[in-house]
């Protein structure tokens, strides 16, 4: 979701955007995730490029070149030196890991785990359905249902999860067509099989060390390979909601 938000804001003309990452990102939809810059130095998503940077000078240099900046900084130590106007917590941890309403003039939290008016100024609904992208000014987002959103009529079966703690070894790549029952990767030498026919829309990076139960793959039953390289409708909706929240704050 963070990449969809960053893409939306940058496309709308907000050019000073910094994405803070962990040292070993665990993104699944990697071809549309700016966190890949942590590994590769840069990542382009739908015409917008992010550069990996090591310090504040690097952040400002990326901005001057019209790029997004991606910095490994899981504890958000960069914020004070940059004087952020807006902070968006897009960790999607289902709980608040330490974000405070005092972190910036406008603090936005995505999904359950935040209370608008208490630990953040606004909460964005992330659950698929009628209220996706709703801006919540007071209170909570919907609780985590535990059921993935429906895509092409598929929910649980389209998601791949780690069967054990261990290291991932991929046997296919993003964009490959897979069949139900096919082994698409192993985790700690245990096979992970596709639950449905479809296109591998997302796949965690090969060699990643993962905990049991983590989402490590995403199969799209619609079969359109082009979806692998474009931002999802969910991320666009949430990105639009964040943009609306920022513009509403500016105009008040």
Residue ranges of model-derived segments:
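Well-ordered secondary-structure scaffolds
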Residues: 1-252
């Amino acid at each position: 979701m963070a990449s969809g938000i960053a893409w939306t804001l940058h496309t709308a003309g907000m050019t000073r955007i910094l994405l803070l990452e962990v040292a070993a990102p665990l993104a699944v939809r990697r071809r549309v995730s700016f966190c890949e810059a942590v590994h590769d130095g840069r990542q382009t998503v739908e015409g917008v490029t992010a550069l990996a940077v090591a310090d504040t000078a690097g952040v400002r240099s990326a901005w001057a070149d019209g790029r997004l900046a991606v910095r490994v900084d899981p504890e958000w130590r960069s914020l004070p030196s940059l004087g952020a106007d807006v902070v968006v917590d897009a960790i999607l941890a289902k709980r608040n890991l330490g974000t405070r309403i005092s972190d910036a003039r406008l603090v936005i939290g995505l999904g359950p785990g935040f209370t608008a008016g208490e630990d953040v100024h606004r909460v964005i609904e992330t659950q698929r359905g009628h209220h996706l992208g709703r801006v919540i000014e007071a209170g909570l987002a919907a609780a985590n249902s535990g059921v993935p959103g429906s895509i092409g009529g598929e929910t649980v079966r389209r998601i791949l999860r780690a069967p054990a703690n261990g290291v991932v070894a991929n046997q296919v790549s993003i964009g490959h067509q897979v069949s139900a029952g096919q082994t698409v990767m192993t985790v700690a030498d245990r096979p992970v099989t596709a639950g449905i026919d479809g296109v591998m829309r997302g796949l965690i990076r090969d060699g990643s060390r993962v905990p049991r139960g983590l989402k490590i793959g995403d199969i799209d039953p619609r079969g359109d390979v082009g979806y692998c390289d474009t931002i999802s409708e969910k991320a666009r909706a949430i990105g639009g909601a964040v943009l609306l929240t920022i513009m509403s704050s500016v105009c008040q």
